[in-house]
């Protein structure tokens, strides 16, 4: 099993798809890494040689990935909340921050519906 950037890459997957198991590496970046290393997208991870894996590790090391990327994202959101801007306020409240409607919809961001309060006296 190939281990790149502290992540076990599934051996039965194609190299392009397997690289997307790393947080911060999507299909586009995985293709660029494969191109830079001279590896076919369709080559299975289990068929990669040690030299090819080393080339991939060198390419992946150039990007911000995994823990560093997660930490950076968290710090950016925390900074928005600290300065009190609109986006930070929406993050704090758990609401969408890009102008979507919230009267209906937005269930993913708001979570499951809360039971309606009855108006009995």
Swiss-Prot record:
Name by which UniProt lists this protein: Small ribosomal subunit protein uS13
Gene label: rpsM
MF annotations from Gene Ontology: rRNA binding; structural constituent of ribosome; tRNA binding
Summary of the function given for this chain in its UniProt record: Located at the top of the head of the 30S subunit, it contacts several helices of the 16S rRNA. In the 70S ribosome it contacts the 23S rRNA (bridge B1a) and protein L5 of the 50S subunit (bridge B1b), connecting the 2 subunits; these bridges are implicated in subunit movement. Contacts the tRNAs in the A and P-sites.
BP terms from Gene Ontology: translation
Subunit structure and binding partners: Part of the 30S ribosomal subunit. Forms a loose heterodimer with protein S19. Forms two bridges to the 50S subunit in the 70S ribosome.
Gene3D superfamilies: 1.10.8.50, 30s ribosomal protein s13, domain 2
Claim: Cell wall biogenesis/degradation is one of the keywords in the record: no
GO CC terms: cytosol; small ribosomal subunit
Family label: Belongs to the universal ribosomal protein uS13 family.
Domain of life: Bacteria
Region (Disordered): 93-121
InterPro entries to which the protein is assigned, alphabetical: Rbsml_uS13_C, Ribosomal_uS13, Ribosomal_uS13-like_H2TH, Ribosomal_uS13_bac-type, Ribosomal_uS13_CS
Keywords: Ribonucleoprotein, Ribosomal protein, RNA-binding, rRNA-binding, tRNA-binding
Organism: Albidiferax ferrireducens (strain ATCC BAA-621 / DSM 15236 / T118)
